[in-house]
Amino acid sequence: MCCVAPAFARSVDFAIDKPAGHPCPNLGTTPTASPTGTPAGSGTPTGGGFGCGIHTQLRQRGFVGCTVYDCFGAGQKVAQVTFGGRDWRQAPGQAPLMFAAFATMRHLHELLWYLTQARDLPAAAPLHDRLDAAVAETQRLSDLPAGELAGVDVDAHRGSVVPLLRQASELARAKVVGRRTPYQSRSVVGKDLRRVDLRGADLRGASAVGADLRGADLTGADVTGADLRGADLRGADLRGVLFLIQSQLDAARGDAVTRLPAGFSHPAHWTVQRTHPGTDPTRAGHPRSGREAGGRAGRRSGRR
């Protein structure tokens, strides 16, 4: 579903143009030997499979965007639950409805992800009843029949959920020990933030493309929707970061010393060597570590 429904344009993230609703030419192919950097469409068709023929070579073939895309489990639910195991190949007449339902489901599952993370924050205890209600309503919408699901007003529902997530964030960030006036910015593209105190920072929706965050302590920092493409997280401490998703890490750079919350993994393209041999990179720019700041402010919960 994820390789068919969305559209993408040729760019630094994708090697080709692909219209919405059209399968990627690498879908259902097997890899063929080719030089690094060869564009898409060089696989061998396998007769209708759902695997990516260049999955292990996506970055080398110019499909970085595929490696950082996260549907939050929406594709599986639409195929297995909403449409009872049928797919767009088995029921081509329903493909447009499937793709419309998928687009809605992805938004709802993304909201479920953030709501679940907010519900797990101890500091957000005063909001638990409202968060539980928001989870239940979002889940109810995601369980609607295909026709109703595709017609859900996602923007209206998001508008009711986002203020609640912001309140949860504010409560959690206020608990960061030693927090001064928190850093806040919506654009830190390419900036050197190694000496900036980012504990409890508000980086919601920030563009941090190529930002230098080496050794940064992001305890209690809210990174909801932050664009971390190419951001340098080597040696950074993200154990207490708020509202992180794996695809943000996949889009960034890091190393073996980058500290992550439980349940997250170091992307395969990250370096494995220490960035600063003999030092504790999490202390760069300030005198305190994540443990001294009160430990992890939240944890990653299971995907919905």
Please place each PLM-identified region on the residue numbering.
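Short, well-ordered alpha-helical segments
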Residues: R130
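Tandem repeat scaffolds
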Residues: R166, A174-E292, R296-R304
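Catalytic cores of enzyme domains
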Residues: V154
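Hydrophobic scaffolds flanking metal-cofactor catalytic centers in soluble metalloenzymes
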Residues: M1-P122, P126, A134-L149, H157-S160, ...
